[in-house]
């Protein structure tokens, strides 16, 4: 079991209705799965490529202790964008962001609506 699955299961057991879990593609060794509550959304894309960024509370702490940043390409960007307090799940490789931070580059993303 992955940490993303376990945190999603914990949220469900505590009464939160969350999104479907996101899964890594088979054979993708650098892929990570995550699930958590949004604390920050970058709604306006400063470089104009149409992606979105989320920061979620995540015990894995891929970006910082207790926090994981998720980069979502334009084609996967949910509409409307979820906001702080909403639950999302994501899976994808961990890559270095423009500020040197570790973040998940989402290949799969699910949002609670």
Residue ranges: model-predicted function:
Residues 35-37, 89-93:
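Residues within well-ordered beta-strands of beta-sheet-rich folds
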Residues 73-91:
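Short nucleic-acid-contacting surface segments enriched for D/E, G, S/T with interspersed K/R
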């Amino acid at each position: 079991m992955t940490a993303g699955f376990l945190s999603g299961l914990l949220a469900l057991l505590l009464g939160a209705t969350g999104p479907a879990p996101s899964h890594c593609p088979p054979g993708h060794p650098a892929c990570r799965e995550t699930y958590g509550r949004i604390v920050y959304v970058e709604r306006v894309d400063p470089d104009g490529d149409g992606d979105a960024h989320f920061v979620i509370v995540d015990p894995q702490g891929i970006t910082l202790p207790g926090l994981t940043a998720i980069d979502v390409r334009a084609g996967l960007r949910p509409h409307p964008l979820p906001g702080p307090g909403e639950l999302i799940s994501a899976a994808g490789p961990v890559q270095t962001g423009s500020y040197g931070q570790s973040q998940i580059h989402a290949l799969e993303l699910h949002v609670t609506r």
